[in-house]
Amino acid sequence: MKFGAQVGVYRNTWDEISGVATVMDKGRWDSIWFADHFLPPPGRPEEEHLTAHEAFTVLSAVAGITSRLRMGHLVLGNTYRNPGLVAKMASTVDHISHGRFVLGIGAAWFKREHEAYGWEFPSMKERQDRFEEACALIRGLFVADEPVNFKGNYYVLDNAPLSPASFQGPHIPILVGGTGEQRTLRTLARYGDIMNLDGWAGGPMTAEYFQHKVGVLTKHCEDWGRDPSEITKTVLMPALVSDDADEVEAFLKGRRLGEGTAAGPKNYVIDRIGALIEAGAQEVMIGGISTMTPDNFQFIDEEVLSAFD
């Protein structure tokens, strides 16, 4: 069983991020993940001035100070960067990390940061269309042994090489963010390598909910003639380990979190994670860790992750 953590790139400092990454690299953690936002979500006007580091830059720096952790984003917003550029950045950081990079990408949802920085924010349908096309383009570059030509409705490649190619073989894995049943999981079945059920999105995060989403993915894989076992099933679960009922309530209310969150005493959090593992989750990423200190991540390592040794 593998465990990761989503480490915040906003409301904190680089020294805090690097300290946490260093401790994680020495512990039980298998992976480190970063959100991709240019303003701190969920978009409160009074918080827009707070720190929000650019996520790919942070990850590149973390690659240089760690030696073991796999790393990626949960998830990059497709509308922020040209997908050809994303593929190039991905292959570069895969070499910096000696093959530890995972490309996590989604259609993007945060309208306010598009407005703030002058990026177009298309309709949901167009964002899904663009996202599917971007996944096709990126995968095409990842798997090709020669320059790639691609002509879509939104993106074009003209005899474009990907050099350096992926450091890891057979190629950098693609994590498709989101579990929308009609479009996103279908895109994952065709172009992705990793599914991630996102507790931030408001689902109940029960074993039954997880298995339902896997069932939908399996049907899409059948439609494309793909073996669903080729796709790794993962979960992002916001969590807080605390015996203090007031702290738990404040955590849930302050972040507007619901059923997708495991907040409570240690054994409750362990049981919630264990149920997802029994349902077939192959990796659990813990998100929403409110205290960005090495000691807190070490505490979760020793008190929660150790239960699954």
Regions found by a protein language model. Name each.
Residues M1-D309:
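Active-site-adjacent structural elements that line small-molecule/cofactor binding pockets in enzymes
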